[in-house]
UniProtKB/Swiss-Prot annotation:
GO terms for biological process: negative regulation of DNA-templated transcription initiation. The gene is mraZ. It comes from the Bacteria. Pfam families: MraZ. GO terms for cellular component: cytoplasm; nucleoid. Belongs to the MraZ family. Keywords: Cytoplasm, DNA-binding, Repeat, Transcription, Transcription regulation. Forms oligomers. Transmembrane segments: none annotated. It comes from Maridesulfovibrio salexigens (strain ATCC 14822 / DSM 2638 / NCIMB 8403 / VKM B-1763). InterPro entries: MraZ, MraZ_C, MraZ_dom, MraZ_N, MraZ_sf, SpoVT-AbrB_dom, SpoVT-AbrB_sf. It is found in: Cytoplasm, Nucleoid. This is Transcriptional regulator MraZ.
Length: 149
């Protein structure tokens, strides 16, 4: 896994957000110029390094005969994406339309999810943590994943 853990961060009025040192290292290992592609999904901003974004984009655009709903979904994900670069201080600038879509305020949470990281409004992330996940073990088992705990 590439991106793990979570961190509370503050975003400034210009939308600049400092990534954690571990996330910055991962970005630079996949993209020497420090590029990240951001898009919106499920109410949060999702960040991909160029190789992982290319894989996702290829998968989405190679779907044969997608339904209208799926075409619209793909359209929103790809057309709503923006490539940004880390600045000298290790910050990314989140475009205003993505900040608005993600309902991001000053206080945010970075959450590592393997091949990507997510940027959540702090209140939304805390609400996510309050959800009851007891019933997901059955769904995981159906997918062939048995949790050892």
């Amino acid at each position: 896994m590439k991106f793990r853990g979570h961190a509370h961060r503050s975003m400034d009025a210009k939308g600049r957000l400092m990534l954690t040192p571990e996330y910055r290292d991962q970005v630079y290992s996949d993209s020497p110029d420090g590029c990240v592609t951001l898009t919106i999904f499920e109410g949060n901003i999702v960040g991909f390094t160029p190789p992982d974004w290319a894989i996702l984009e290829e998968k989405l655009t190679s779907i044969k005969s997608p339904s209208r709903k799926l075409r619209n979904f793909i359209r929103i994900i790809i057309s709503g994406s923006e490539e940004v670069s880390l600045d000298k201080q290790g910050r990314i600038t989140i475009p205003s339309y993505l900040r608005k879509s993600g309902k991001l305020d000053k206080d945010v949470v970075l959450a590592g999810v393997g091949d990507r990281f997510e940027i959540w409004d702090k209140r939304e992330y805390e609400a996510l943590l309050e959800q009851d996940f007891d019933d997901v073990s059955d769904e995981l088992a159906e997918c062939g994943v048995e949790l050892p705990f």
